[in-house]
Amino acid sequence: CGICATVCPSCIIEMGPEGPHAISEMSCMSCGHCVAVCPTGALHNTRCPIDEQDPIPMETLDSKTAFNFLRMRRSIRNFKPELVPEEKIRQLLEVTRYAPTAANSQGLYFIVISDKEKVRKIADLTAQWMEEQIAANSPRKRYFVKTLQIYRDRKVDIIARNGSQLIFALCRRLNTTGISNCEQAWAYAELYAPTIGLGTTIMGFIQTCAQEN
């Protein structure tokens, strides 16, 4: 029917007398669209084998349910001292595999820190970076001064929020869309987290410090 050729984002599928064929396999981005849209399940792509696909029989969410699901996402800034089990961390990160990446480039990886002392050290290093920014008369100076007053003088962990675990989403420097890909992946994780009993937030100070160093 030619639907696969129509939806192929790389425009490498053509219809021949014996059906669809790839005119440039090297240009395939492994997105799997061709396999997904085939109405008869007849298309096989070596990069997305049909026998490895698991159809998901579910009704499309109505717009109100979908809207409310997205609205319910909240940043959690008060964390319990207990560590989240590794199994749940893996479950959380599994969903990030299905987040969109530009040109299906993927190439993301994660570092999980499950050590309260290491998290505290990272928060302290971030505070030191803020002090350096203040000394350098950064445009963010006034904001950092207030933050450090809370962190240093009042002993309130406004940087890591007393969290016991951190997850860093990373990409290679040469990946020009890597940062936005990481953000998309983490958005998936944040939306999924409450369904498995977890709370998350984006540690903005730590993120900015890491990106600038």
For each of these PLM feature ranges, what is it?
Residues I3-P20, H33-I50:
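Iron-sulfur cluster-binding cysteine motifs and their immediate structural context
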Residues T6, P55-R90:
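Specificity-determining recognition surfaces
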Residues A22-V37, Q53-R71:
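Short microdomains enriched in Cys/His and/or Lys/Arg
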Residues P57, R77, L93, E117, ...:
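PEST-like low-complexity intrinsically disordered regions enriched in Ser/Thr/Pro and acidic residues
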Residues L92, T96, Q165-I167, R172-N213:
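Small-aliphatic-rich amphipathic alpha-helix that forms the alpha element of a beta-alpha
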Residues V95-T101, L108:
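Non-catalytic interaction/regulatory modules that flank or connect domains
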Residues S105-Q106, A160-S164, T195-I196:
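Short gly/pro-enriched beta-turn/loop segments at secondary-structure junctions
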Residues V112-C182:
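Glycine/small-residue-rich phosphate/adenosyl-binding loop
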